[in-house]
Amino acid sequence: MAQYGNQDQMRKTDEYGNHVQETGVYQGTGTGGMMGGTGTGGMMGGTGGEYGTQGMGTGTHHHEGQQQLRRSDSSSSSEDDGEGGRRKKGLKEKIMEKMPGQHEGEYGQTTGEEKKGMMDKIKDKIPGMH
């Protein structure tokens, strides 16, 4: 199929059919016909074929400077040390935490205080409810 009109007025498109704005100076011509024509040229590169098309480069994408966020499904890396602070868990503790069932040598809070329930915490915040 022959191309009609002035080639300078033709719109360029990328590999997805989106219009591409031309910037800068470019050289190259496309020639072709119904059979056996070749095409060369373009801003970044050309393709040759039956009808002579002008190419706009390759479709490879490199995202430099962007890092992919990776998350593991591991548990928390620290726990309460029983003295109001936090301490780092070891590998054994993380593995034991994931395993089902009772854990005999578990670390935990060793204070003798009674834990407050949700209602007790709310009542403590409301003035005059003591």
UniProtKB/Swiss-Prot annotation:
S-S bridge residues: none
Biased composition (Gly residues): 27-58
Induction text: By abscisic acid (ABA) and salt stress.
Keyword Chloroplast listed: no
Keywords carried by this UniProt record: Stress response
Keyword Secreted assigned: no
Pfam families named among the record's database cross-references: Dehydrin (PF00257)
UniProt-annotated stretches for the region Disordered: 1-130
GO biological process, one term: response to abscisic acid
PANTHER family: ABSCISIC ACID AND ENVIRONMENTAL STRESS-INDUCIBLE PROTEIN TAS14, DEHYDRIN XERO 2-RELATED
Family assignment from sequence similarity: Belongs to the plant dehydrin family.
Protein name: Abscisic acid and environmental stress-inducible protein TAS14
Organism the protein comes from: Solanum lycopersicum (Tomato)
